[in-house]
Swiss-Prot record:
Disulfide bonds: none
Keywords: Host membrane, Host mitochondrion, Host-virus interaction, Membrane, Modulation of host cell apoptosis by virus, Transmembrane, Transmembrane helix
Function: Plays a role in the inhibition of host apoptosis. Prevents host TNF-alpha-induced mitochondrial membrane permeabilization and reduces caspase-3/CASP3 and PARP1 cleavage induced by the intrinsic apoptotic pathway.
Gene Ontology cellular component list: host cell membrane; host cell mitochondrion; membrane
Residue spans crossing the bilayer: 113-133
Membrane topology: Single-pass membrane protein
Principal subcellular localisation of the protein: host cell
Species for this entry: Molluscum contagiosum virus subtype 1 (MOCV)
One GO process term, biological-process aspect: symbiont-mediated perturbation of host apoptosis
InterPro entries referenced in this protein's UniProt entry, alphabetically: Semap_dom_sf
Protein's name according to its UniProt entry: Apoptosis regulator MC163R
Record localization: Host mitochondrion; Host membrane
Domain of life the protein comes from: Viruses
Amino acid sequence: MGPRAQRARSTLRKLRRALCGRQDSPARARTPENRHFARKCARTCEHGYAHTHTCEDTPAKEHGHLGEHECLRGHGHAHAYEERCENKHKHLHAHEHTHERHGRAPRRLALTAPLPLLLLPLLLPPMILLFFLSPADAKPVLERQVFWNHSEPRASFLTPPHGPGAPPGGPFLTAVGGDGTLYLIPSNSSNPPVCVEIPLPYGPGHENVITLLLVDGGPRTPDALTVAACLEVGVSLLTTNATEPTNASNSSPRLTGSCEKLRTWALGNPPFTRVCGTGGGTPRCWALSTNGSIHDLGLDGVGYSPPQHNGTRPLLCTNTSEPHLHSCEHTAWNGDHDPQRCTRTPLDKHGQSWSPQCHKSTAPNQLGTRPPLLITKMSDENGTDYVYFLIGGSGDDYPPLLARVCEDDCWLSGHWTPRLQTVLQTNVSCANASALLKSTSGNGGPIVLLVEGEGGNGSICTYSGLDTGKHFAHTPQLGETGPRDPLVGACGHNGDVPESLAKKAREHPDLKQTLTPSGGPVALPGLDPRHVTALGTGPGLLFLGTNQSNVFLLRMNDNGRPNGSLTLFWNGTGNGNGRAGPRGPVLGLQHSSGGGAGAAGLLAVLFGDGVTVLRTEGAL
């Protein structure tokens, strides 16, 4: 055997002891994968050594110079496999240490590593989870969009249809587009984003549709859906079959005059819709019935109390031309189910105004020169229902006052007292209230007021429903002979009232103690409170939509106290469909749970050109 073969033999023996004979044998490998590669490397090394021994046992004269080169090539081949095994071993060794870091660290690491390094593997997974669930980083996800062809700045959300006449696939987000089409958008995230379009009659330019409202199918039309359309040219009533919602037909004549406002008051049997606005410059209201009839009520109103006990109780409304309240009752139904008529009466130097046909009305300007703004209905701790509203304000002799009346009449000192003669008022510490936000839903929810500040900015003040009720119930009032006991009573039905008690009630006493907010003020930086749309989804959340397409979020606790400051929830961009970028003012907001077990919450944002639905799961 030549010198070169001897050197190769010596080198291979050293490699065998270093690689194939090391302690990391297949039996000591920690994982099945490592054991497999260890056995493969061992077989490769043994094959190389067997080839080397064959070359060594062959006489040099038998293989000569060529044979020696063949053996050396075999040695080199084995050496290459050994290097490959060595590299693979290093990779597996590092892989095993990776498993050790996620499981039990080696003893030598426990003796030398600092304590924070040892705790890092345990803390890393929770830190990653908190990072992804952080409210500051979580963003709403685009769920679906609906666009209409004509941008309409007066587009609005409507009462969703339900009952036997509603189309299948609900619940719905209902909106009217500027193209004169009604859109029923499934709010359930499990339903496909398919809209039901109900064309409405409109004039040239598609610009005369102001708003409209769905009315459930009543007993007379159980299989149909009635749509009350409020147009610039008047009021129209349409009835459509639920199975063919696109085949709408005009079932009643139009009335001249426009509808600037629309409020609802469904009476249950038969269902009614009250549409109020101006007709020929004169404030008026219409009652639209599902049987195809339209009643001219003639009452000028801009605000209504929320639906009361399924529409079976009187309606509280405010006057447009004269700042006072009316109580329109439905006690004068006749055999044809016509609603009570309202008559036009002279009001001295103030001219003529439409008033209800009952004595339950405050005197003109008795509540200030600004029309009262109805806020919400809440129950006190005794279960008595009250309607809250805001009166007075900047530029008036009256300061901003928060007032309330019984939803129905009040029982005071053993007598029934008309509710409009028992208006209680209290000062609020958030002065110069210029705009009103929706209160959060549910009894005891906070009253939310948006107040005007310097430089066009504004602030949010919240008033706990429970604290507000206690303030009205337990604050001394000012009477004819000075301070007297709090005016505490129960709400009930109509009854006769002694004139002496009614005279005291008509004083509308101011509560001496000012109602202070339970939370706030929370600044609205750079936001004009006159151009903010608000949506309260419960005691915990308040959404604000701006005229820059943004949606802000304010979190509150159960008492209505804000938790932190106003945060940007959605910037109004990234809408897709070639319409990325700002969409214009937010015209409406609606929030729903999405329906179904585990379904994500959905926030619908209404713009002039369509509706964007955001999935809020994980972002609230």
